């Protein structure tokens, strides 16, 4: 018991010093251009009018459908959710003991009553609304056997008070790509869209270690 009383404050103190999740770093290899495009291609003499890399049919447009092709993702995300919960319950017990009688005498000292009552009432309300508008240019990193494009890309903005980054990954059907090589973010399957930042502005929106300590799930109050 003594050891428990000593370890509990230490654990709570460490919870308050817990660091937030590490932010992503620049120059991530996962978001680099496809490796097979970095290797120099063999130069072939095809004449001045014909280039194998840019060959396409007269009935075919220049939409992105090959590894390394570039397309623009139009970000149009809007979510809204709300939830409300309420719980209440109560329990009440009453028990009375009559005065026993022995040889015609009542033993008043042994009489009495016991009662107990417990009540709980809790309620919670949660509401969240998110909106993201903009655009980001990504590259095709893989073409699946069924023609679905695996896209991936990032954008970093270095500002006076820190950095902001945006990352998009997911699967896109080639048929959903418009003629101007753009696609809506709502057409991306398994989409992973990240928009965050780091620096002075981001630190100002982060809770300090003492606030995290009191808001930690292990805090008893």
Curated annotation (Swiss-Prot):
One of its GO terms (molecular function) is cytoskeletal motor activity. Residues 1-16 form the signal peptide. A lipid is attached at residue 17 (S-diacylglycerol cysteine). The keyword Cell membrane does not apply. Keywords: Bacterial flagellum, Cell outer membrane, Lipoprotein, Membrane, Palmitate, Signal. A lipid is attached at residue 17 (N-palmitoyl cysteine). The keyword Lipoprotein applies. It is a lipid-anchor. Pfam families: FlgH. It comes from the Bacteria. GO terms for cellular component: bacterial-type flagellum basal body, distal rod, L ring; cell outer membrane. InterPro entries: Flag_Lring (IPR000527). It is found in: Cell outer membrane; Bacterial flagellum basal body. GO terms for biological process: bacterial-type flagellum-dependent cell motility. Assembles around the rod to form the L-ring and probably protects the motor/basal body from shearing forces during rotation. Belongs to the FlgH family. HAMAP family: FlgH. The basal body constitutes a major portion of the flagellar organelle and consists of four rings (L,P,S, and M) mounted on a central rod. NCBIfam families: PRK00249.1-4, PRK12407.1. This is Flagellar L-ring protein 1. It comes from Yersinia pestis. The lineage of its organism: Bacteria, Pseudomonadati, Pseudomonadota, Gammaproteobacteria, Enterobacterales. The gene is flgH1.
